[in-house]
Amino acid sequence: SEFGVNISNLTISEKHSTGVAGIFVNKKTGENAINVVPGAAGKITKSDIDNASQTIKESEIFLTQLEAPLDVVEYAIEIASSNNIDVILNPAPARKLEQKTFSMIDYFTPNETEASFYVEHKIETQEDAKKAANQLIDKGVKNVIITLGEKGVYFANEKQNFFTNAFDFKGKVVDTTGAGDGFNAGLAVALAEEKK
């Protein structure tokens, strides 16, 4: 297409509307709560993934999240992983994954709330993030990146772990909507460029 986005696997549903998300923003903190109505995205099937499998196999990075049916997302992850494509999973919204799926994830990028879901304890400190990352690595994830909002990011794999502070923009946060999406997009681009 004119902006360089491959839309060859785009399908239009005659039966279902485009998914929508109602986003409520706290004016004081900029934090949000999101209510999603998946629409057509909730109707994606394994057959749709089969139709797009060649695109997945030719990709440098496979980035996905959990707003589509879980069995379909896990199926797509399996295709990417079995073809040695780096998989980034942004587990939003947090949902129970099959144990085997964790070992197919190259980069697992939950925020602190999502990470808490998978390790069953709150993440409020760097030490909590370190403990959670180690638990996720024990499940089979290769690299864990827990985003901690204005506090920064915690990274861990079997060889190293570190915390990085968030940039201080010295301005008021108006709305955090899309912060995780932007982070994951930036990560995917950086990893793809590193492969070139």
Where are the model-predicted features located?
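Short, structured patches in soluble enzyme cores that scaffold and shape functional sites
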Residues: 24-26, 36-39, 66-68, 91-93, ...
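Conserved beta-alpha-beta core of the PfkB/ribokinase-like small-molecule kinase fold
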Residues: 48, 52, 60-131, 151-153
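Residue-level detector of short coil/turn "hinge" positions at structural boundaries
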Residues: 6-7, 87, 123, 143
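Conserved phosphate-binding/catalytic region of the ribokinase-like
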Residues: 96-101, 126-196
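Short, acidic/turn-prone active-site loops that include or flank metal/cofactor-
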Residues: 39-41, 92-94, 113-115, 167-170
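Conserved N-terminal subdomain of the carbohydrate kinase-like
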Residues: 1-60, 78
